[in-house]
Amino acid sequence: FVITSDMGLCGGYNANVYRMIQDEFSAQDHVVMVGVRGAAWISKRNYNVENVLSDLDEDDVYNALSKCMQDALDLFEKKEISKIQILYTHYKNTLTFVPTLETVLPVSKPQEEKKSGMHADMIFEPDKETMLQNMIPMVTKSILYSRYLESKTSEQASRRMAMESATDNAEELQDNLELAYNRV
């Protein structure tokens, strides 16, 4: 999954994502593009685009993303794809957002924690495997939606900064032109 913007005027937001696509993806990788700008960009390149989600209705975003994630999970379960990754823009603060590639599946094994003196045997009902089969789709869909929202936050912050910079430049140009006019 690659999450880009639906609108322009957001500075280098999309360019940073495109650069990471070129660095991290090959032509054989299955790609799901989320966002109008990314779909337009990738259509001119040699990538294996499985699906394009653009101009998503705000009320139906989760359902659309959920359906795509379920399709990816089905491919993963059939071993047609080896991993599911999300390329999104991680929001740190208003000025900092970083393109990030996160592997959702397969899940990496957590590092062993030191054993404490207490150990409790857990009884799972239903059994662990059934619980995992039910939880994995729920968790992966939630992760995708969360990354989508984080990317949208980054997009808006980037757009705000670009517009603020454009306004500052326009005011500076106006001041310079006013000075030049008054000298004449």
Each predicted region: which residue ranges?
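C-terminal beta-strand-loop-alpha-helix "lid" module of Rossmann-like NAD(P)-dependent dehydrogenases
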Residues: 1-184
